A protein has these predicted regions:
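Von Willebrand factor
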Residues: 157-159, 353-478, 508-519, 543-545, ...
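VWA/integrin I-like adhesion module and closely mimicked acidic/polar interface patches used
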Residues: 481-530, 535-537, 545-550
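Periplasmic-binding protein-like
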Residues: 116-129, 202-205, 250-285
């Protein structure tokens, strides 16, 4: 009886030790290694960590225990590099979904000091273009050889407009899949002003969405393609997320293709799930490195494949035939360089800023001249163009209007609409409706004298003094291009704008000249002094393209 009690007690002690420490031999306080992994791969990493803990690992004479938390890669990157406050325990090792986040954190002094790449990849997952079987059948969007042009407008080689395809792009500021896709589209379009305009057109046309990094997220995407929404949408997701969705809904799998890039090598981009060490204590650093090596073991890699990832060398698990996914290694696209990713992300972020514009609308007698188009005067051409252009600005745009070329006692302009949100009410009308009404009803002044350059200078001073960093700030000039007043030569205005220009508080002049009788060369010089641009408009149908070119200039200038 006594022996039985002793044996029972020993068993109880042993079981208790295993429950607390995850290993029978840990008789001292364990050396904890806190690992934070991307949300999608965290369950697989936790599975491997449990197996690692049960093998009685030690470091510097102490037992080691790994605990795994999950976090969004973008959020964790901001905390590690010091751009956001840290919540919870310090991180000793980090597994983001892409090396893009490692590059981003190391671009900051804090991140460069803390983040220590190991060169190890825990797993991989290629990116795929995804839609539903129904949308793919209705549109034939995947019948041609797949490429990143599928995300582009039809004018740049994308699907015909008649297909009604819309693009849901995971937000490149928070999604490695989205940023990688943006880089691939940029490569597809090449370099130069025309390519920059095309990228802008693409960015303005897509819908920025959450990251479709799981089966549940893809289910939300699929729901938008069904009644009552019935969207014909395409998006980008990892192979692992597609496999997860197909496993959950085997009777209605997704239609997904590997998109081939435009630059050599002509391969498919992927997320590479790097393992980086962030520990500061030498003992924890060694323990974290030990777990990193274990993640490369055959057992750990088999776990990654079981969870739908490819192993670190790109080898996939056996895949269900219904998904029609590749059960072999893929030809990979070259990874985005840090500079390439940063440049594309910067442009995207500037496009994400709202617009804050002061519009100068010419109503001088010069606007009575014929435009040479369907018996329209320049003023009528401007009115049609302005109405079309206004429709291209989102409701969050801040906008005001000055009429120039109309007699004014103290100013070379008349304020028609004060600056504010287009969606806000001014009396009974919204600001958008008020501006649209002014465009439609504005008449030229029979005796006004256009002090164009004085008005531009006054507007530039006002916008500079009231600069709002959360917007792209600009003075937009709609004019025939003639300064009839003559008090200030163009060269003087250029010199003054150059003095006022502050690259850290950037205000651009964007000039649209109507007709060919004005001094377009002067407008080009004036706009260039502020990093802006000038355009000639001869047809209202051109305004869409002019708008995209102007926005492209504002983003990259």
């Amino acid at each position: 009886m006594v022996i039985a009690v002793v044996v029972a007690a020993v068993c109880m002690i042993t079981l208790t030790a295993k429950a607390v420490f995850g290993q029978a031999s840990c008789t001292n306080t364990p050396l904890l290694v806190n690992v934070v992994a991307s949300n999608d791969i965290a369950p697989a990493v936790e599975n491997v960590a449990n197996a690692f803990n049960n093998q009685n690992p030690t470091s510097a004479g102490r037992c080691v225990q790994v605990q795994v938390d999950q976090a969004d890669s973008a959020t964790e990157a901001a905390q590690i590099d010091g751009q956001a406050g840290r919540q919870g325990a310090a991180v000793d090792a980090w597994i983001p979904d892409s090396s893009l986040w490692v590059d981003a954190t190391r671009s900051y002094p804090v991140g460069a000091q803390i983040v220590q790449p190991t060169g190890q990849s825990v797993a991989r997952s290629p990116l795929m273009l995804v839609t539903t079987k129904a949308v793919a059948t209705e549109t034939g969007v995947f019948t041609a050889p797949p490429g990143w042009a599928l995300l582009l407008p039809s004018s740049y080689g994308g699907p015909p407009a008649s297909t009604g395809i819309s693009v849901d792009l995971p937000d490149p500021t928070t999604s490695a899949a989205g940023l990688t896709s943006l880089v691939q589209v940029s490569r597809q379009l090449g370099t130069g002003p025309a390519a920059r305009t095309a990228v802008t057109d693409f960015a303005l046309g897509v819908q920025s969405t959450e990251n479709f990094d799981s089966a549940a997220a893809l289910a939300q995407f699929v729901a938008t393609t069904q009644p009552p929404f019935d969207r014909r949408a395409i998006t980008v997701a990892t192979e692992q997320a597609v496999l997860g969705y197909d496993k959950n809904t085997p009777k209605a799998p997704l239609d997904a293709v590997y998109a081939t890039g435009a630059s050599q090598p002509l391969g498919t981009p992927e997320l590479d799930y790097p393992y980086v060490v962030t520990a500061s204590q030498p003992a924890v650093l060694r323990a974290a490195a030990k777990f990193g090596n274990y993640l490369q073991s055959s057992y750990a890699q088999s776990v990654m494949r079981a969870y739908g990832f490819r192993s670190s060398n790109g080898v996939p698990d056996v895949m269900p035939r219904s998904t029609e996914l590749a059960a072999q290694q893929l030809q990979l696209a070259s990874a985005a360089t840090p500079a390439e990713a940063a440049a594309n992300l910067q442009d995207w972020q500037r496009l994400g800023l709202g617009f804050r514009d002061l519009v100068l609308q010419d109503v001088s007698p010069a606007m009575n001249q014929p435009s040479g188009l369907a018996n329209l005067s320049l003023e009528q051409l401007l009115a049609q163009t302005a109405s079309k252009g206004l429709g291209l600005f989102p409701d969050g745009t801040q906008m005001g209007v000055w009429l120039i070329g109309k007699s004014s006692v103290s100013h070379p302009y008349t304020e028609a609409v004060p600056i504010g949100p287009l969606s806000a009410n001014i009396g009974v009308l919204t600001r958008r409706a008020d501006i649209d009404q002014i465009d439609a009803t504005a008449t030229t002044s029979p005796s006004g004298s256009l002090a164009l350059y004085d008005a531009i200078l006054d507007a530039y001073r006002k916008m500079s003094a009231s600069y709002a960093p959360q917007y792209v700030n600009a003075v937009i000039v709609l004019t025939a291009g003639n300064d009839a007043h003559g008090d200030m030569p163009a060269s003087s205005l250029v010199a003054q704008l150059q003095k006022l220009y502050n690259p850290n508080r950037k205000v651009e002049v964007i000039a649209l000249q109507f007709g060919a009788q004005g001094n377009f060369q002067a407008l080009q010089q004036i706009a260039a002094a502020t990093g802006g641009a000038a355009f000639q408009v001869t047809n209202p149908a051109e305004i869409g393209q002019v708008f995209v070119e102007a926005v492209s200039q504002r983003v990259s200038g």
